[in-house]
Design a protein with these regions (language model features):
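Beta-strand-rich structural segments
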Residues: 49-61
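Edge beta-strands of extracellular beta-sandwich domains
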Residues: 122-128
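Short amphipathic beta-strand segments in non-cytosolic proteins
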Residues: 71-87
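Bacterial signal peptide processing site
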Residues: 21-24
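Aromatic sugar-binding surface patches on proteins
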Residues: 90-97
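A short beta-turn/strand-edge loop motif at beta-sheet boundaries
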Residues: 47, 62-67
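Residue-level recognition of secondary-structure-to-loop junctions
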Residues: 90, 102-104
Length: 130
């Protein structure tokens, strides 16, 4: 009887261990984004003043995205209520720009929305105004 109990326990432990172990391999994830945004400011580095935000927007293959609607919003991350938004104007070759008055230094969060023919992309970019 003891032998039967021992064997039953061994079988039970084996079943539990094989149920807990996963033989499935995780699905491959791709890190390629459908849109790449290169962000720069004029002047550079960003200073308290009228600041031009320049966005170079390309697809996953590095080709410029032209004719898109590019909405931008900026929020001061250290001060609630300090934000602005607007539509960037196309400059050609995938470049878009908007000018805003940054009267306060500190940390800012730029949210960029790119929309064009089935493409609806959002990216957040942190930057500092000196």
């Amino acid at each position: 009887m003891r032998k039967l109990t021992f064997i039953s326990m061994l079988v039970l432990i084996s079943v539990l261990l094989s149920a807990c172990g996963s033989a499935a391999t995780p699905a491959a994830t791709t890190s390629a984004k459908p849109v790449n945004i290169k962000f720069e400011t004029n002047p550079n580095p960003a200073m308290k003043s009228d600041l031009e935000l320049i966005l170079t927007i390309t697809d996953a293959n590095g080709q410029p995205i032209e004719g898109a609607t590019v909405d931008v919003a900026v929020d001061h991350t250290d001060m609630t209520g300090m934000g602005m938004s607007g539509l960037a104007t196309e400059q050609g070759d995938g470049r878009y720009a908007i000018t805003a008055d940054f009267s306060d230094s500190g940390n800012w969060l730029l949210t960029v929305y790119v929309r064009k023919e089935g493409l609806d992309y959002k990216e957040e970019i942190e930057f500092t105004v000196q």
